[in-house]
From Swiss-Prot:
Superkingdom to which the source organism belongs: Bacteria
This protein's record includes keyword Metal-binding: yes
Protein's UniProt name: UPF0313 protein PA4928
Annotated family: Belongs to the UPF0313 family.
InterPro entries cross-referenced by the UniProt entry: Elp3/MiaA/NifB-like_rSAM, Methylthiotransferase_CS, rSAM, rSAM_horseshoe, UPF0313, UPF0313_C, UPF0313_N
Protein species of origin: Pseudomonas aeruginosa (strain ATCC 15692 / DSM 22644 / CIP 104116 / JCM 14847 / LMG 12228 / 1C / PRS 101 / PAO1)
UniProt-listed NCBIfam families: SAM_YgiQ
Annotated positions binding [4Fe-4S] cluster: C385, C389, C392
Cofactor: [4Fe-4S] cluster
Length: 747
């Protein structure tokens, strides 16, 4: 892997003399107070501006400020006109546009395509403060305001839509976001390196159209430049020329080949022979090789080609060996440079050590921003995830190589949070990242890591080259909880339990000191079919971890419970799989509080399965095995009903399905049955989805969540089966006795 220029080695821009601002300005008045006559760079974002390293606009803004640039923020502008996009004036260098920390469509719509009633990234949690496809709208308004100013597109929405992608909300393949956004260049993934490099080059007078060699960027060009070797991957199932089958009954002396051999003339002198070049171009280095994907027009009309393109894209994600990609859109090409080089520990410390205020901008007054409230007292210790779950975008966006901060940097941030953030009570709500326990876990050999093309380091089993030592993380936990003024360090990030069982010492440390009653883990399913499509470990690994968790909890004298996450309707899931999951849930005393159906997000491997019915984890052909897909609303409701098998509202649907599946034996009023024969009046039943507002009650076994909200579970009656008395009351009610009283239905 080629070395990258360290972020702190660039010369500072002349405006460094102004020094860091208390907050990056959001108005002309703030610019005047700072003594600025203009901004060099203006960041437009769909989120409220929170000056905290968990928010993208703060990290990019502070990093550019540290390079000497004057950076302004336009947060959640009114997109109905260009006026809000002009309130800070014309930027000297460029507009940086991002939809926010989430894809704007996922932020606004549920997996069932219903409009959400709130937005966690807006003051007061109000919905409707950003448009659908915000990256497109903001980019177009910036160009409308100042047509000659470069627009640089970034953020997770743009990153995952950089290629022709399936759009769940329109149920079609859309072209690259670059073709619709009128942006000049797109930065994908963690964009610190790319944005600093481009800002420096634009400041030196280079045209944005000439910047085509920065890793982690995508842009439009007409043709492949000279000196590049192009690999054609636009088709699949391309057999070579097949030789004619020889008839074994024909006398070889009668064939034309023999006649030619006998009449062959003088042999060519070997001294006069010349080497013939068979390849159109000699093989060049990977740095000068580009893979041509099927065009937008082809993948739009051919789901199998779409799956093939998705497979090639994911095979080219390791920064150590990835090649450039190109995809034709009409008369032009969209070109994708290889992914950015991961940041070193020193660079991570540099980025997270900026002078963040760690609070929302004062312009929001006392209005609370739910996303900030959730991470207010948390610390991010690393980036990246090598799990490779096919339904998740973290690996695609942050990369498979873990980027770690040093212990000193993390401890300094905890101390700063303790001393600066109002309301700190001594409890750090999370010390983690995309995954709680991948800190400093990496391949044993940098050379192997550089050449690896596996989509996951832990599926189908933990790679023998992966160093699963958790000692550095254990040491960090001990240092953090020893700090004066820190009472408790909680771990709220999702735990990769298949890694944790490799280190019993880590599990003991975690369970003894860092669990606040509940610990989130994500088995996602119990059946092998969907788990293989998700690239998740078998349920047996969960059982091993559960044994460890309960053992160490008992030794610590603590009442603690696991909160497992499950997904309904994921590609590869059959009705029988969901039935078996429901039986497992009942057998283990779990009752789902919230239910999440699979959400096809742009560019995810599972989304390619959903759209194409093929499995991109293996070589894709027109004849390759298909994947079971759950698309109809009725079947999605059924799969969610299996997860909430205890909810009377879903019982009619479950009875019908069980009879159709030949499993009517599961309908009855005994403990071994899944659904009862009676149907109580559920008119007063309240949905558990009510805005995630019910506070958590006392700790009880049997809770589980199937939405990855990060919020605490709500109180319920736990996972206890109905008592005989409850069953008798419900049966009597169903038969018409005691009509004046509702049965006590556990929720």
């Amino acid at each position: 892997m080629q070395a990258a220029k360290p972020l702190f080695d660039y010369p500072k821009y002349w405006a460094e003399c102004f020094g860091p601002a208390p907050f990056l300005p959001m108005s002309r008045e703030e610019m005047d107070q700072l003594g600025w006559d203009s901004c060099d760079i203006i960041i437009v974002t769909g989120d409220a501006y929170v000056d905290h390293p968990s928010f993208g606009m703060a990290i990019i803004g502070r990093l550019l400020e540290a390079q000497g640039f004057r950076v302004g923020i336009i947060a959640q502008p009114d997109w109905q006109s260009k006026d809000d996009f002009m309130k800070l004036g014309e930027p000297n260098l460029f507009f940086g546009v991002a939809a926010g920390n989430m894809d704007s469509m996922i932020n606004r719509y549920t997996a069932d395509k219903k409009v959400r009633s709130d937005d966690a990234y807006t003051p007061g949690g109000l919905a409707g403060k950003r448009p659908d496809r915000a990256s497109l709208v903001y980019s177009q308004r910036c160009k409308e305001a100042y047509s000659h100013v470069p627009v640089i597109l970034g953020g997770i929405e743009a990153s995952l839509r950089r290629i022709a992608h399936y759009d769940y909300w329109q149920d079609k393949v859309r072209r690259s976001i670059l073709m619709d956004a009128t942006a000049d260049i797109l930065l994908y993934g963690n964009a610190e390196r790319a944005v600093v490099e481009i800002a420096q080059r634009l400041a030196q007078g280079e045209l944005v159209s000439a910047i085509t060699d920065v890793r982690g960027t995508a842009f439009v060009r007409r043709d492949t430049p000279e000196g590049w070797f192009e690999i054609d991957s636009t088709r699949i199932d391309r057999p070579g020329k097949i030789d004619k089958i020889i008839n074994p009954y024909v006398n070889t002396q009668d064939t034309a080949a023999c006649a030619i051999e006998q009449e062959k003339g003088a042999q060519e002198d070997p001294q006069e022979a010349k080497v013939v070049q068979l390849l159109a171009n000699p093989r060049l280095t990977r740095e000068k090789t580009v893979i041509r994907l099927p065009s937008f027009e082809k993948v739009r009309n051919d789901p199998v080609l779409y799956a093939h393109a998705n497979r090639v894209l994911h095979l080219e994600t390791n920064p150590g060996n990835a090649r450039a990609l190109v995809q034709k859109h009409g008369e032009v090409d969209v070109w994708f440079n290889p992914p950015p080089i991961p940041m070193s520990t020193e660079e991570m410390d540099y980025v997270f050590g900026m002078p963040y205020a760690r609070v929302p901008h004062p312009a929001y007054g006392k209005a609370k921003i739910p996303a900030y409230e959730m991470i207010r007292f948390s610390v991010n210790i690393m980036r990246g995830c090598f799990g490779g779950c096919t339904f998740c975008s973290i690996t695609e966006h942050e990369g498979r190589i873990i980027q770690n901060r040093s212990h000193d940097s993390i401890i300094r941030e905890i101390e700063e949070m303790r001393d600066k953030v109002p309301g700190f009570t001594g409890v750090v709500s999370d010390l983690g990242g995309p995954t709680a326990n991948m800190y400093r876990i990496a391949c044993k050999s940098p050379d192997i890591e550089r050449h690896c093309r596996k989509p996951s380091c832990v599926f189908p089993g933990i790679c023998e080259n992966l160093d699963t030592d958790h000692s550095s993380l254990i040491e960090l936990y001990r240092k953090a909880r020893a700090l004066p003024g820190v009472k408790k360090i909680l771990i709220a990030s999702g735990l990769r339990y298949d890694l944790a069982v490799e280190s019993p010492e880590y599990v003991k440390e975690l369970v003894t000191h860092h669990v606040g009653g509940y610990l989130k883990i994500a088995p996602e399913h119990t059946e092998r079919g969907p788990l293989d499509k998700m690239m998740k470990p078998g349920i047996g690994t969960y059982d091993r971890f559960k044994q460890m968790f309960e053992k160490f909890s008992k030794e610590a004298g603590k009442e603690q419970y696991l909160i497992p996450y499950f997904i309904a309707a994921h590609p590869g899931t059959t009705d029988e799989d969901m039935m078996n999951l429901a039986l497992w849930l009942k057998r283990n005393g779990f009752r789902a509080d919230q239910v999440q159906a699979f959400y096809p997000s742009p560019m995810a491997t599972a989304t390619a399965m959903y759209h194409s019915g093929k499995n991109p984890l293996r070589k894709v052909t027109y004849k390759s095995d298909g994947v079971t897909i759950v698309k109809s609303d009725q079947q999605r409701r059924l799969h969610k009903a299996f997860l909430r098998y205890h909810d009377p509202k879903g019982w009619p649907l479950l009875r019908e399905a069980l009879e159709r599946m030949g499993r009517a034996d599961l309908i009855g009023n005994g403990k071994h049955h899944l659904v009862p024969t009676y149907q109580p009046d559920t008119g007063e039943y309240q949905s558990a989805r009510r805005k995630n507002s019910t506070p958590a009650g006392s700790k009880k076994a049997g809770k589980l969540l199937t939405q990855h909200t990060g919020l605490p579970p709500r109180a319920s009656d736990g996972g206890k089966p109905w008592s005989k008395g409850q069953q008798n009351k419900a049966t009597a009610f169903a038969k018409g006795k005691k009509k004046s009283r509702q049965p006590n239905i556990p929720r």
